[in-house]
Design a protein with these regions (language model features):
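Arg/Lys-rich, positively charged N-terminal/basic patches that mediate binding to nucleic acids
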Residues: 1-38
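Enriched for short, Lys/Arg-rich terminal
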Residues: 70-105
Length: 105
């Protein structure tokens, strides 16, 4: 059975900002839609196989049960809950996303 996917407020804001950033640097809204769509598909893949995402603790160097998926230049950090997967944050891979997450913790 597939888990429901829930996006945090931060993740939804991040998604908008990722789209804006891609349009700003590329000048191509279609490219931004393609990148966002690819990330949403990767997150959807984690619905059925939540452990398929990479372990975040290996990257940030601190204990966490969170995982992440990457699609193109976008990355989604998610937590596996009992009945759903919560997408906590979304980053452009060109950001210093590890520092953002370490400061959060």
């Amino acid at each position: 059975m597939s888990a429901e996917i829930v996006y945090s407020t931060d993740a939804l804001i991040d998604l908008d900002e990722a789209w804006d950033f891609t349009v700003e640097i590329s000048g191509d809204p279609d490219l931004a839609f393609q990148q966002v769509d690819a990330l949403l598909e990767a997150v959807e893949g984690a619905r059925s196989y939540p452990l398929a995402g990479s372990r975040l603790d290996v990257v940030v160097g601190t204990p966490t049960d969170s995982r992440y998926v990457v699609a193109g230049r976008l990355l989604a950090v998610y937590s596996i809950e009992e009945h759903f997967n919560r997408v906590d944050r979304i980053f452009d891979t060109r950001q210093d996303w590890v520092s953002v997450l370490v400061r959060r913790g």
